[in-house]
């Protein structure tokens, strides 16, 4: 069963590229035609590239890898946060901090600081022994850390792959991933450089519907990979991994919504399985 249909791609406006004067000649092979000064992307190619990216993400997660979702432009922020959270993956949908990958040891220390401040707040000691001014500064520090690092707060190591919406805007993230040899999976609009992406998906990276659809497809691949990982561990008799934040992995627990949705897509009734 196809992970996405041509009809869905058309409805999402995935085929609309940029104006013909704003393009990267390297994208010529992915362009079907031109209409009213706008390049039209070849969705037949998009379908095959989606399948390739889907399989890569699924296999990466099945082997224990993590996928970092990145998209800080307004059109991508909600989809990135929602879909990454749905499958327990880290995400960045605010400003990308330079060194988030290449200097992760320092970023990790900031994550520990965020958790420290959260613990102080929970214990009621964030304001307890501090002056009003000090308490205000600590509160602002916590809010800033939450805003910039909240999506990766549970990330303890570098991701096995990154999903990126708009490689031109997120060029620093792309550069850092390439420098570290982390595979880049991304939407390729007609103004992008395909040489920078390992698993490209030719498509519209500006329209909310297009971005939401393609990000959902990648999240579905993650979900299927997580299910394969859990099944493999159960077969091997190995202990279950640490739970994904906010998600229980115990065999006796009810299926999460994304698991039920995935089974439904495959024509399986979760209730008949007794889960």
UniProtKB/Swiss-Prot annotation:
GO terms for cellular component: cytosolic small ribosomal subunit. One of its GO terms (molecular function) is structural constituent of ribosome. This is Small ribosomal subunit protein uS2. It comes from Acidothermus cellulolyticus (strain ATCC 43068 / DSM 8971 / 11B). Keywords: Ribonucleoprotein, Ribosomal protein. It holds the Pfam family Ribosomal_S2. Residues 232-256 are annotated as: Disordered. Belongs to the universal ribosomal protein uS2 family. One of its GO terms (biological process) is translation.
């Amino acid at each position: 069963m196809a992970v996405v249909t041509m009809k869905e791609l058309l409805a999402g406006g995935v085929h609309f590229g940029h104006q013909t004067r704003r393009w990267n000649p390297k994208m010529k092979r992915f362009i079907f035609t031109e209409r009213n000064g706008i390049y039209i992307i070849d969705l037949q190619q998009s379908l095959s590239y989606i399948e390739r990216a889907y399989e890569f993400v699924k296999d990466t997660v099945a082997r224990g890898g993590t996928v970092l979702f990145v998209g800080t432009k307004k059109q991508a922020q909600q989809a990135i946060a929602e879909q990454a959270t749905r499958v327990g993956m880290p995400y960045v949908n605010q400003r990308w901090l330079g060194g988030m990958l290449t200097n992760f040891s320092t970023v990790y220390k900031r994550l520990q600081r965020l958790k420290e401040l959260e613990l102080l707040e929970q214990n009621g000691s964030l304001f307890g022994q501090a002056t009003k001014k000090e308490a205000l500064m600590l509160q602002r520090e916590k809010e800033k850390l939450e805003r910039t690092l909240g999506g990766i707060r549970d990330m303890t190591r570098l991701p096995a792959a990154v999903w990126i919406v708009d490689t031109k805007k997120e060029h620093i993230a792309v550069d850092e991933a390439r420098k570290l040899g982390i595979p880049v999976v991304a939407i390729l609009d007609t103004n992008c450089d395909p040489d920078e992406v390992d698993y490209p998906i030719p498509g519209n990276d500006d329209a909310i519907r297009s971005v939401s659809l393609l990000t959902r497809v990648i999240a579905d691949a993650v979900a299927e990979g997580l299910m394969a990982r859990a099944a493999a561990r159960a077969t091997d008799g190995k202990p279950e991994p640490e739970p994904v934040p906010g998600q229980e992995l115990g065999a006796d627990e009810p299926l999460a919504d994304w698991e039920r949705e995935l089974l439904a897509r495959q024509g399986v009734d979760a209730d008949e399985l007794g889960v």
